[in-house]
Amino acid sequence: MAITLINPEGLPEIDVYRQVAIASGSRTVFIAGQVSWDADGVTVGAGDLAAQVEQCYLNVATALAAAGATFADAAKLTAYVVDWTPDRMAQFMEGVTRAARKLGTTPAAPATLVGVQALDIPDHLVEIEAVAVLD
């Protein structure tokens, strides 16, 4: 495996991701921001943050698979969420949990969540991008 995830001593341990990803592979995969579209370009879960997060993670998994990667190869995840407030974390994590169940894995790469005013299409509440490293 080209990625080793750790929580170093001196930094808080976060349940849903690791603080550091050590990449030893030779190929880097950059996944464009994935929104909650299905394969036909139709928005999934309009107005429902959990449903959109779930679809975004499923789309990231599809993109990773096309490159021969999985979430185990992810070195960094970044989520952009419209009108973010901390009280929406439970909805966000519900979507992550549902996607993880469907995928049979829990994304644990270092992650950043950024609140934004808007995304490209008004129905989109979240966009998630990934960087993965392969041997």
Annotated model-derived regions:
Residues M1-L58, T62-K76, V82-D135:
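N-terminal presequence-like segments and the immediate start of the first folded domain
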